[in-house]
């Protein structure tokens, strides 16, 4: 009887682990995130992780640069 409990708990743990991993894999595949700051077009900057909080991210001379953050537009400090 003890073996049955162990088998059932291991099976349940494997099912929960599999469901969690597959859900995480789906979320990771939703959008591509670029870590490099190099760019050729503005759309490459929009996928960049450094420009997530940026309101106006531009590709200046091959490098993504932020020209304004969300916090600055919502709560101006000046």
Curated annotation (Swiss-Prot):
It is found in: Secreted. The keyword Phosphoprotein does not apply. Keywords: Antimicrobial, Disulfide bond, Fungicide, Plant defense, Secreted, Signal. One of its GO terms (biological process) is killing of cells of another organism. Residues 1-24 form the signal peptide. The keyword Signal applies. Its main location: secreted. GO terms for cellular component: extracellular region. Disulfide bonds join 39-59, 45-64, 51-66. It comes from the Eukaryota. Belongs to the DEFL family. This is Defensin-like protein 287.
